A protein has these predicted regions:
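Active-site metal-binding core of divalent-cation-utilizing nuclease and nuclease-like domains
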Residues: 39-76
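Structural motif
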Residues: 79, 97-99, 120
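Domain-level recognition of nuclease-like catalytic cores that cleave nucleotide substrates
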Residues: 111-158
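Conserved catalytic cores of phosphodiester-cleaving nucleases, focusing on short active-site segments
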Residues: 24, 58-60, 78-88
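Mg2+/Mn2+-dependent nuclease catalytic core
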Residues: 87-112
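Residues that flank catalytic or metal-binding motifs in active/ligand-binding sites
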Residues: 54, 78-80, 118
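Acidic-basic catalytic patches of nuclease active cores, encompassing PD-(D/E)XK
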Residues: 1-54
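Short, solvent-exposed loop/turn segments that connect beta-strands within catalytic domains
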Residues: 64-77, 93-94, 116-117, 130-133
Length: 158
């Protein structure tokens, strides 16, 4: 059973991610946050398995969308898949010095999307009042930014 401390940390991390999503959505009218069905529909549109629906948070279009508008892609419309990584740490030179976790599904979706001509990128967001902002890094450029990388397994026992 998870400790109350780990539960508190999870809630805090979820709040930080929500704040980062809100910051991004308010700062860029080209961003849209699809619901679960919308994410699956986007993947279906690309011919990618729906199991990757949680491996991205937002879609960036070439046109502005309103927050309450249901996302409907126009025929041949280009878009990008965006995965948010957020922190409250002071990072004045984003994305430099950013520490984050990423799942195998995020990397696999990035690979498949890239093969289909769709950009997949991470949006590194700092919520610190003195360094609030964001930086996009395309998954194909990520290795150029990585200083160190390690594998961590998340295991569920039966």
């Amino acid at each position: 059973m998870a400790s109350s401390k780990s539960y508190t940390i999870t809630l805090k991390n979820n709040r930080t991610e929500r704040d980062a999503l809100d910051l991004m959505l308010h700062s860029d009218p080209l961003l849209h946050e699809p619901d679960s069905a919308g994410r699956k529909a986007l993947l279906e549109h690309l011919g990618i398995d729906g199991r990757f629906s949680r491996a991205f948070d937002m879609v960036k279009l070439k046109r502005a969308v309103t927050g309450d508008e249901k996302l409907v892609l126009q025929e041949g419309e280009e878009f990008e898949l965006v995965e948010i990584k957020s922190t409250k740490k002071f990072l004045p030179d984003l994305p430099s010095k950013f520490f984050f976790g990423a799942t195998e599904n995020e990397f696999e979706l990035g690979r498949q999307a890239t093969e289909k001509g769709v950009r997949y990128c991470f949006a590194f967001v700092s919520l610190h009042p003195d360094s609030e902002g964001h930086a996009y890094v395309d998954i194909v450029d990520l290795d150029d930014w990585i200083r160190a990388k390690r594998i961590q397994y998340q295991i569920n026992l039966k």
